[in-house]
Design a protein with these regions (language model features):
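N-terminal Sec-pathway targeting helices
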Residues: 24-46
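Catalytic cores of phosphodiester-bond hydrolases, prominently lipid phosphodiesterases
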Residues: 19, 35-38, 46-412
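General helical secondary-structure elements
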Residues: 7, 25-29, 54
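Short, positively charged and aromatic/hydrophobic N-terminal segments
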Residues: 5-7, 19
């Protein structure tokens, strides 16, 4: 009897264990199915978002593309056929907050002058019909893709010629590489996805505009062009992320289009082996030797380290490398990018003795403040970028300058 009860109890325990194990297995399978379904739904939703994003981005690009091409073509024709008829060269003294001729005679150097610069210098307004697609981009990306676009929807610059006429002597090109049938070309725009409206879509056309103005103003102060190669692309029309072959092709375009106006790293270095050696000697070239010239600087974002590796001597390169402060010991670096003027002010003792060319941003559209402007004027930077430069377009908006001038001496 006892044995029977024991066996019955043992069987019950065994059955209970089997039942619990079976339920656990069943529950595990249910959880697995829920996880699998959740992942499927997530990836389907992600695919829908990405597809919607790509469709909207492509639509914005193509809406702006035709207008960009037509604008640049008509602008170059206007300059050639109308603007320069009876043209009077710009008086460089009129844009300088100092006696220019005296400074030239005294040998004032490139790094002893501050130039007012524009940021994303080819910026135009997106076509109105693109806004619905931009809002779609904003929606499907939860506001991430559009960035600050809607804050900047009224932000635009004069043409490059207009900026040069207003005394701007430093401009910026954000550049995308495009490959078609093996041929590499370059497009200038702030952002291929949401901000592709530009007055200078084709790089060669942009350089042609600069060279044409330079030819009509042969004794102008040096023009500094900051080039930022984009590290991401929209998979459309053969756009590619910058690589070694793209940068080599870019240098070739600069040499072809700028010709003897290009003031190369080799021109700047003279007999020095590196920019570090040249800076220690505080021997940047005098302005007088740079009149009528164009200096091209490669922005630290993207490709600088690989660009330097192509030729560490910089003798065959077309652009002067820029770096961030933390990379200041790079021997080939001539420029430092300090986007925040307060950082440059905090490091002012370093910049006073290191003899770098420094680029900072005085404002960021639509935001500006007198405090930041004061820091920009104090920080010893030679390239001071503003989104509120003197201009013809939108004259009702705020304007920043050096008390009415666009070039000033730096007091070290």
């Amino acid at each position: 009897m006892f044995l029977f009860k024991f066996k019955s109890k043992g069987r019950c325990i065994s059955e209970k264990l089997w039942y619990n194990k079976s339920m656990a297995t069943h529950k595990g399978k249910r959880i697995g199915k829920i996880i699998a379904v959740t992942l499927i739904v997530f990836f389907l939703a992600l695919a829908i978002v990405i597809t919607g994003y790509m469709m909207a981005a492509r639509k914005v690009y193509f809406i702006n593309k035709v207008d960009n091409e037509n604008f640049q073509k008509s602008n170059l024709e206007y300059l050639k056929n109308t603007f320069y008829n009876g043209y009077t060269p710009k008086d460089e003294q009129s844009i300088c907050a100092f006696d220019l001729q005296k400074a030239l005679d005294e040998g004032v150097r490139y790094n002893q002058v501050a130039f007012l610069a524009t940021h994303n210098s080819c910026q135009r307004l997106n076509r109105p019909e693109s806004e619905e697609y931009l809002r779609a981009l904003d929606y499907v990306s939860f506001g991430l893709a559009s960035g600050d676009f809607f804050d900047k929807k009224n932000f635009e610059y004069d043409t490059l010629t207009g900026q040069l006429e207003h005394g701007i002597r430093s401009i910026e090109f954000d550049v995308e590489a495009k490959v078609s049938k093996g041929d590499i070309s370059f497009k200038v725009m702030h952002d291929l996805v949401v901000d592709s409206a530009t007055s200078c879509l084709d790089l060669e056309g942009a350089l042609e505009e600069v060279v044409t103005w330079s030819n009509h103003n042969p004794n102008h102060l040096p023009i500094t062009i900051l080039v930022e190669s984009k590290a991401y692309v929209l998979p459309v029309e053969g756009f590619q992320v910058f690589g070694s072959r793209h940068v080599k092709a870019f240098d070739e375009v600069l040499r072809k289009c700028l010709g003897d106006k290009l003031f190369t790293p080799s021109d700047m270095l003279g007999d020095y082996a590196t920019f570090e050696e040249m800076r220690k000697a505080n021997d940047w070239k005098p302005l007088k030797e740079m009149l009528g010239k164009v200096v091209v600087v490669l922005h630290e974002a993207g490709f600088v380290k690989k660009y330097i590796k192509q030729d560490p001597t910089m003798r065959t390169q077309a652009m002067i490398p820029s770096v961030l402060y933390e990379d200041r010991n790079t021997p080939q670096a001539g420029f430092i990018i300090e986007n925040k003027p307060q950082d440059a002010v905090e490091r002012i003792d370093f910049y006073r003795t290191a003899n770098f060319m420094v680029r900072t941003r005085a404002d960021k559209y639509p935001h500006f403040s007198e405090e930041r402007y004061a820091l920009a004027n104090q920080c010893l930077s030679q390239i001071i970028t503003t989104d509120y430069a003197p201009r013809d377009l939108r004259p009702e908006q705020h304007t920043f300058s050096f008390d009415g001038f666009t070039v000033k001496l730096i007091s070290f």
